[in-house]
Amino acid sequence: MAKIKIQQVRSRIRCPKDQKRTLDALGLRKLNQIVEHEATPSILGMVNKVRHLVLIVE
């Protein structure tokens, strides 16, 4: 599988709990933090759920 890098670019303040939990599941806890994951359907679904808070870094 391909690897993707995900960066949190917007704050989690005022986000619903499910979106905060999704960020936690992705390993994103701070602004501008970058994590690397395999591009599995479950990870891509999580990224899609919080797409307004994160950026895919190539």
UniProtKB/Swiss-Prot annotation:
Keyword Ribosomal protein in record: yes
Pfam families from the UniProt entry: Ribosomal_L30
InterPro entries noted in UniProt: Ribo_uL30_ferredoxin-like_sf, Ribosomal_uL30_bac-type, Ribosomal_uL30_CS, Ribosomal_uL30_ferredoxin-like
Keywords recorded for this protein, A-Z: Ribonucleoprotein, Ribosomal protein
Any one GO biological process: translation
One GO molecular-function entry: structural constituent of ribosome
GO cellular component: a single term: cytosolic large ribosomal subunit
PANTHER family: LARGE RIBOSOMAL SUBUNIT PROTEIN UL30M, MITOCHONDRIAL RIBOSOMAL PROTEIN L30
NCBIfam families for this protein: rpmD_bact
Family recorded in the similarity comment: Belongs to the universal ribosomal protein uL30 family.
Subunit structure: Part of the 50S ribosomal subunit.
Protein name per its UniProtKB record: Large ribosomal subunit protein uL30
Organism per entry: Porphyromonas gingivalis (strain ATCC BAA-308 / W83)
Lineage of the species this protein comes from: Bacteria, Pseudomonadati, Bacteroidota, Bacteroidia, Bacteroidales
